[in-house]
């Protein structure tokens, strides 16, 4: 199987695309920039959905669905919002054989349509907070696309909340940011930096944007999630007011936040290898694959298959997500490689010797193929749990070690510091922690000269002392520690 996949070191982009297609995660559609998410890829998205949906409901959010067709006039109501998204609009001007009185935009994001509805639903302080989540599709007319990472249409969730006070809205924004961080690290086994975006990089229409930033194996950063504090911007644009306890009319404060199918791309790029996909157990649709190793004799094969069914039954009874591969036409080696390519965490082999010894042979996806051992059926469930937990931790630890090795600190300590910074960014990739004055000119020049952007003002380094620190470009007094990186 790995003979048909590009080398990660020689052609990272093709390696990624090979995994997407040959693991049957997605395929190209007839529409440029759009993808078909295949059943196995969609099962990963379904797993992401089920975990996050439960967490959203635990924090008081409800699901709803809003139209994907948005009147163009709605988007014009928030100036910054339309300026930020208008280049990516897909606009419908004709329908039903007639020209529309007002063009409709295919949903690029839902703030405007949702806040139009909130103006009808919110009248009193008793209506607040209003916390709604939507699972939907989005259309943004991207010029350069890549499956899962950047597509014209993609799936996502978007949360939209309304609050009586600024404090509540900011608290909600940061609560969701932390929820995303824990999800990324605890379930996807991807270490992330969290922090505030610069004014240049923030969401169009937000007061402030916070992001989750991860490092891929090609040492480029990927923005995995965002959470926005919207202030009063959309409430004023759509005249959303409530009567407070004193009878005064006030505008409501807002947040919005989201993640998308881009996370599947992140999973591939953080964990996978040249044998194919590697999935952390907690997010894998299939945790265990049981592969009977058939012989030529039908009588022996029946014993192997009956025993394999018993193994599957025992694992399902212990509430593992398990499947069996009963393909008699393909060789064991091909079936092993197929399971590896799909990234299934645990492979259990069942041969006639296992039947006779009341045992099975276990193999872990993230270990070398030599790492396999026999274990009795009686202790299988407990041992599998240990291996799955260990694999989850090991994948996170490996990704964290990789990020640590590829996060460098470069501060201004002399007149040549920026040239050293620029040379490093042009010759290497990864995160670079440095200092910034907060100036847009410096940010733009650094981006133009290095292709690196400010990914965020990271929370991890808030405790660091800025006394005596200077902007890496202009040498004026630094206001922030920032993370620079080239990114997707």
Curated annotation (Swiss-Prot):
It is found in: Cytoplasm. InterPro entries: aa-tRNA-synt_IIb, aa-tRNA-synth_II, aa-tRNA-synth_II/BPL/LPL, Anticodon-bd, Anticodon-bd_dom_sf, Pro-tRNA-ligase_IIa, Pro-tRNA-ligase_IIa_arc-type, Pro-tRNA_ligase_II_C. It catalyses: tRNA(Pro) + L-proline + ATP = L-prolyl-tRNA(Pro) + AMP + diphosphate. One of its GO terms (biological process) is prolyl-tRNA aminoacylation. Keywords: Aminoacyl-tRNA synthetase, ATP-binding, Cytoplasm, Ligase, Nucleotide-binding, Protein biosynthesis. One of its GO terms (molecular function) is proline-tRNA ligase activity. Its EC number is 6.1.1.15. GO terms for cellular component: aminoacyl-tRNA synthetase multienzyme complex; cytoplasm. It is an enzyme of class 6 (ligase). Its main location: cytoplasm. The keyword Cytoplasm applies. Consists of three domains: the N-terminal catalytic domain, the anticodon-binding domain and the C-terminal extension. Belongs to the class-II aminoacyl-tRNA synthetase family. ProS type 3 subfamily. Homodimer. Catalyzes the attachment of proline to tRNA(Pro) in a two-step reaction: proline is first activated by ATP to form Pro-AMP and then transferred to the acceptor end of tRNA(Pro). This is Proline--tRNA ligase. It comes from Borrelia garinii subsp. bavariensis (strain ATCC BAA-2496 / DSM 23469 / PBi) (Borreliella bavariensis).
């Amino acid at each position: 199987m790995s003979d048909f996949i590009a080398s990660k070191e020689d052609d990272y982009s093709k390696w990624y695309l090979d995994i997407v297609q040959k693991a049957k995660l997605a395929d190209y559609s007839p529409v440029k920039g759009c993808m078909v998410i295949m059943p196995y890829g969609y099962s990963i998205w379904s797993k992401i959905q089920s975990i996050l949906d439960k967490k959203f409901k635990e924090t008081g959010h409800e699901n709803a669905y809003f139209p994907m067709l948005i009147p163009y006039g709605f988007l014009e109501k928030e100036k910054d919002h339309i300026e930020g998204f208008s280049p990516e609009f897909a606009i419908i001007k004709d329908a039903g054989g007639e020209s529309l009185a007002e063009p409709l935009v295919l949903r690029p994001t839902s703030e405007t349509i949702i806040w139009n509805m909130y103006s009808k639903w919110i009248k009193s302080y008793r209506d607040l907070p209003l916390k709604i989540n939507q699972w939907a599709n989005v259309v943004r007319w991207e010029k350069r696309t890549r499956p899962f990472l950047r597509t014209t249409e993609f799936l996502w969730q978007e949360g939209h909340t309304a609050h009586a006070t600024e404090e509540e809205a900011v608290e909600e924004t940061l609560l969701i940011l932390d929820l995303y961080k824990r999800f990324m690290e605890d379930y996807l086994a991807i270490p992330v930096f969290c922090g505030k975006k610069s004014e240049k990089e923030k969401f169009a229409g937000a007061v402030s944007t916070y992001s989750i930033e991860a490092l891929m194996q090609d040492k480029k950063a990927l923005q995995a999630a965002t959470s926005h504090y919207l202030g009063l911007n959309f409430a004023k644009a759509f005249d959303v007011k409530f009567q407070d306890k004193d009878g005064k009319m006030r505008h409501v404060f807002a947040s919005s936040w989201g993640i998308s199918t881009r996370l599947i791309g992140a999973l591939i790029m953080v964990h996978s290898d040249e044998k194919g996909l590697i999935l952390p157990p907690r997010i894998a649709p299939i945790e265990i694959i049981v592969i009977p190793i058939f012989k030529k004799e039908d009588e022996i094969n029946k014993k192997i298959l009956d025993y394999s069914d018993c193994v599957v039954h025992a694992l399902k009874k212990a509430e593992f997500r398990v499947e069996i591969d009963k393909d008699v036409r393909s060789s064991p080696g091909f079936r092993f490689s197929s399971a590896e390519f799909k990234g299934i965490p645990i492979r259990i082999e069942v041969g006639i010797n296992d039947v006779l010894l009341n045992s099975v042979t276990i193999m872990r996806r993230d270990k070398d193929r030599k790492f396999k051992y026999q274990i009795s059926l009686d202790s299988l469930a407990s041992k599998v749990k240990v291996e799955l937990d260990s694999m989850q931790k090991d994948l996170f630890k490996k990704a964290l070690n990789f990020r640590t090795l590829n996060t460098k600190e470069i501060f201004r300590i002399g007149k040549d510091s920026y040239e050293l910074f620029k040379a490093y960014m042009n010759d290497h990739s990864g995160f670079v922690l440095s200092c910034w004055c907060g100036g847009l000119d410096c940010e733009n020049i650094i981006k133009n000269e290095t292709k690196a952007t400010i990914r965020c003002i990271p929370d991890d380094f808030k405790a660091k002392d800025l006394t005596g620190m200077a902007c890496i470009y202009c040498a004026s007094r630094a206001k922030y520690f920032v993370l620079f990186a080239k990114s997707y």
